[in-house]
């Protein structure tokens, strides 16, 4: 399905719907530009207390830190806001982007000597098709489509695309679903790292789990 400019599709993660089937992981591996590697990560939230899983894709930051710290100018952002994997001729394998990403998304693929990450299946979305992961997700944890459809199908939650890290708020192209009665304008990731309340918001818990190792070693 293709969309016009006025009804551009949105990419939404609803982590509370993830059932851990890994269909998204397998589909990502089959994407033609991914060289047989999955660029989506299935995170396990607080393994000691729950079996809950959550998919983690590139959030496609409005001002991508990964691109800003790249000394070789290897990471490009499209006019539609998609942050792409590093360009092979330019990437020098320094891993600056890996260390700089607030969401822990970029990965150095040593066998290719190249940073690779989710590019929202740009070969598909640029021609009006859904990303592979959203196409196969059976529970709707990964959704790609009209913004108004998100509101119609998920009446108890709403999307947010702003995440606070200390004094910095990061705005992203990809959104996460939060409870509709939560009136906060952003998800405070730093607070989740320090508080980590039992049974707390899944979106915060998964980000806390992803970032905790980096914080503990700093």
Task: Give, region by region, the residue ranges found by the protein language model.
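Non-ligating segments of multi-cofactor redox enzymes
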Residues: 1-218
């Amino acid at each position: 399905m293709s969309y016009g400019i006025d009804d551009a599709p949105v990419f939404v993660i609803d982590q509370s719907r993830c059932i851990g089937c890994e269909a998204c992981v397998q589909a990502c591996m089959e994407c033609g530009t991914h060289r047989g590697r999955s660029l989506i990560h299935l995170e396990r939230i607080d393994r000691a207390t729950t079996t809950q899983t959550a998919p983690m894709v590139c959030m496609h930051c409005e001002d991508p830190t990964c691109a800003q710290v790249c000394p070789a100018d290897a990471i490009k952002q499209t006019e539609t806001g998609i942050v792409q994997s590093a360009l092979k001729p330019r990437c020098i394998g320094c891993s600056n982007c890996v260390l700089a990403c607030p969401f822990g998304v970029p990965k150095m693929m040593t066998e290719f000597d190249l940073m690779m990450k989710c590019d929202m299946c740009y070969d598909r979305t640029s021609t009006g098709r859904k990303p592979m992961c959203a196409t196969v997700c059976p529970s709707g944890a990964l959704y790609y489509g009209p913004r108004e459809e998100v509101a119609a199908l998920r009446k108890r939650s709403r999307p947010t695309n702003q995440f606070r890290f200390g004094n910095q708020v990061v705005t992203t192209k990809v959104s996460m679903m939060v409870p509709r009665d939560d009136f906060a304008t952003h998800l405070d990731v730093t607070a989740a790292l320090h508080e980590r309340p039992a049974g707390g918001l899944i979106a915060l818990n998964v980000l806390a789990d992803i970032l905790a190792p980096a914080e503990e070693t700093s």
